[in-house]
UniProtKB/Swiss-Prot annotation:
NCBIfam families: PRK05422.1 (NF003843), smpB (TIGR00086)
Region Disordered, annotated ranges: 124-152
UniProt GO BP: trans-translation
UniProt protein name: SsrA-binding protein
Molecular function GO terms recorded: RNA binding
Length: 152
């Protein structure tokens, strides 16, 4: 896995990520060229079930600058490519258990294909977010204290 094109940094703060999946994305040529320039935003996006498919909604891939009038729509719905068993598992979790599909990271794989890391997630309540923030602060303070004790 190479350097991410786009990351959803709020995903791990707002949700408990139970399981992650690597999904391909159906893109047009101008979308691929726009991604190659490193321009994308998945912070406000989510994945949803439409029929027996899973689609990425509200992901922003800006229009390619050197394209002609056949450029793509920036926030169109994009189909995610997963194995049928994975799709069925995700559909069951979303519809029966009330889980959410959250995009975590958009990146190029070793073969040069655009991949999306999707997390099967459960929403956090406000007190869970506070607990997460307190734990993160404690880990930071602990690391700072350990660093101070090292060379004295």
């Amino acid at each position: 896995m190479s350097k991410p094109i786009a990351e959803n940094r709020r995903a791990r703060f707002d949700y408990f990520i139970e399981e992650t999946f690597e999904a391909g994305i159906m893109l047009t040529g101008t979308e691929v060229k726009s991604l190659r320039t490193g321009r994308a935003n998945i912070a406000e996006s989510y994945a949803s079930v439409e029929g027996r498919e899973i689609v990425l909604i509200n992901a922003d891939i800006p229009p390619y600058g050197h394209a002609n009038r056949f450029n793509h729509e920036p926030r169109r719905h994009r189909k995610l490519l997963l194995h049928r068993r994975q799709i069925d598992k995700l559909i069951g979790a979303v519809q029966r258990e009330g889980r959410t599909l959250v995009p975590i990271k958009l990146y190029w794989n070793d073969k040069g294909l655009a991949k999306l890391e999707v997390g099967l997630a459960k929403g956090k309540k406000l007190h869970d977010k506070r607990d997460t923030a307190a734990e993160r602060d404690w880990q930071r303070d602990k690391a700072r204290l350990m660093k101070g004790d090292r060379g004295d």
